Amino acid sequence: MTRLCLPRPEAREDPIPVPPRGLGAGEGSGSPVRPPVSTWGPSWAQLLDSVLWLGALGLTIQAVFSTTGPALLLLLVSFLTFDLLHRPAGHTLPQRKLLTRGQSQGAGEGPGQQEALLLQMGTVSGQLSLQDALLLLLMGLGPLLRACGMPLTLLGLAFCLHPWA
């Protein structure tokens, strides 16, 4: 077995005198005994670390909610508005189509499962009007420009909701 021989640490002089061990409880030299405390001890380091951590957390929360939060909210509002205002004019509910006995519904078909429910969604025309293009442009610029784009988003929403549009 190999032992690592390291030099023993030398005893340091303590600036605060420590009473001798032979004294009883309550007996002493008259001065209180305090442990050595450095100016950058664990308490100051922990306090500084906590303050810096809280500051960084506050800056991160402020950055997230001041930029990304409103931008994502505007994007959600623009999508919902566009969907509500430009849904198909026909049926909004899916139509049901039942299969006849001779038709197969596909994988997973078992005995007695001859009827299946197929959903057909309404078709939307592929043409984009000038109003739709302006709405998408103004509402798309809003989140990109963050706080400066808020008036553009509101202008796009007002233009879309205006009766003459």
Swiss-Prot record:
Listed Pfam families: DUF5562
Membrane topology, as annotated: Single-pass membrane protein
Transmembrane residue ranges: 135-155
Cellular localisation: Membrane
Domain of life: Eukaryota
Species annotation: Homo sapiens (Human)
Name of the featured protein: Uncharacterized protein C20orf141
Region: Disordered, residue numbers: 1-36
Keywords assigned by UniProt, alphabetized: Membrane, Transmembrane, Transmembrane helix
GO cellular component terms, A-Z: membrane
Cystine crosslinks: none
PANTHER family: MCG9903, RIKEN CDNA 1700020A23 GENE
